[in-house]
Curated annotation (Swiss-Prot):
Gene3D superfamilies: 3.30.420.100. Keywords: Ribonucleoprotein, Ribosomal protein, RNA-binding, rRNA-binding. This is Large ribosomal subunit protein uL18. GO terms for molecular function: 5S rRNA binding; structural constituent of ribosome. This is one of the proteins that bind and probably mediate the attachment of the 5S RNA into the large ribosomal subunit, where it forms part of the central protuberance. Part of the 50S ribosomal subunit. Contacts the 5S and 23S rRNAs. The keyword Transferase does not apply. Belongs to the universal ribosomal protein uL18 family. The keyword Ribosomal protein applies. One of its GO terms (cellular component) is cytosolic large ribosomal subunit.
């Protein structure tokens, strides 16, 4: 008979690739609420979470679909939508008196200019205090959708490709070239809530 175990089975959520427990422990020991930002193909979800023994508690949340209700006509999974979702979350959090947090990026790799850091920048601009390095956040031009505008202008020469690429924008009545102005309009609307 064996005297000791040679193989230790990892926790279920680690096996499923959902949780990095070492990182989670470090975040929980900070004692601050966690800004959890998650991106899917078509949406951005941002939540301010607090630890509880029975399970994490959502203090404040924002979803990119809330932007549509406010009049946003762009795609809900791009960088401008991520920034606006973070701004909306930050505005809600500051109103609730939650001004301090720490970023929980989950299992996402820390890539410069990623949507998760656009959410972080939005929360910072709303007045939250979250430690981060400025070099990881995307340029202002990418956050407001100027890169989408430039691509649309480039693609405009081929009318068929332009209509295929930006069909949803055109369907909603927004020219992709007007995205930065539309972004600024919605940003002002969120800040004046």
């Amino acid at each position: 008979m064996a005297q000791n175990a040679k193989h230790r089975v990892p926790f279920r959520r680690r096996r499923e690739g959902k949780t990095d427990f070492r990182q989670r422990l470090g975040l929980l020991l900070s004692g601050k609420p966690r800004l959890v930002a998650r991106k899917s193909l078509n949406n951005i979800i941002a939540q301010l979470m607090a630890y509880d023994e029975k399970g994490d508690i959502v203090l404040v949340s924002a979803h990119s679909r809330e932007l549509v209700k406010m009049g946003y006509k762009g795609h809900c999974g791009n960088l401008p939508a991520a920034y606006l979702t973070g701004l909306l979350l930050g505005k809600k959090a500051v109103e609730e008196g939650l001004e301090e947090a720490i970023l929980d990026k989950g299992l996402h790799r820390a890539t410069k200019g990623a949507a998760i850091f656009a959410v972080l920048k939005g929360a910072l601009d709303a007045g939250m205090d979250i430690p981060c390095g400025e070099e990881i956040i995307a340029d202002e031009e990418r956050l407001n959708g100027t890169h989408i505008k430039q691509y649309a202008e480039l693609l405009k020469e081929d009318e068929e490709a332009y209509k295929k690429q930006f069909s949803k924008y055109l369907e909603k009545g927004l020219n992709p070239e007007d995205l930065p102005e539309h972004f600024e309009e919605l940003k002002g609307k969120i800040l004046n809530l």
